[in-house]
Amino acid sequence: IEQLALQVSWADFNSPEQLEPEIDEQRLSASAIYTVPLADEGWWSTTIAWGLKDPSEDETMHAFALESAYAPDRDWTFFARSEVIESHELGSGGTIDTVGKISLGAIRDFHVMDNVKIGIGALYSVNSVPDELEPSYGGDPDGAMVFLRLVAGT
């Protein structure tokens, strides 16, 4: 299937964190991307990804992401992303916490040369944190941003 790309990787790190030099880690990740061309120079692409972090002195932690982007033509792209991660570095005394985030956004591209485009985009995100972390994070925070993107060579 030429529209499908698969990736698997594994790494063994000796002392990757300066604050915890005595801890080694193994990491594993896998992802799949499926992209389909659409009429009028458009496309649709979806990615699913998973990661595992296995510290030598702590529990194994997982991360998941699902994202999709839809470009009905060469000027617009609409996207959505959902992610969930487990981490012991979020402030609750070293326990593993699960946090999540959902983002929606759009980009409008302006073609300034044959192979150069500048895009202006915006996104809105909502985060989910466990109850014990809500005082530190101000509840389940949300946020928005506007950004510029430069793409050359396409």
Question: Model-flagged regions — what are they?
Answer:
Residues I1-G93, I102:
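Detector for outer-membrane/organellar transmembrane beta-barrel domains
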Residues L104, G138-T154:
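Outer-membrane beta-barrel "beta-signal"
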Residues S128-P135:
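Low-complexity, intrinsically disordered Gly/Pro/Thr-rich segments
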Residues I23-E25, D97, P135-P141:
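Flexible, surface-exposed loop regions and adjacent strand-edge segments
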Residues L90-I96, I107-D109:
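Short, glycine/charged-rich beta-strand-loop motifs at protein surfaces that mediate ligand recognition
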Residues V8-S9, I48-W50, I118-N127:
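Extended hydrophobic secondary-structure segments that form protein cores and membrane-embedded regions
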Residues L90, N115-I120, R149-T154:
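Flexible, glycine-rich linker and terminal segments associated
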Residues G105-L123:
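C-terminal closing repeat unit and adjoining cap/tail of repeat-based domains
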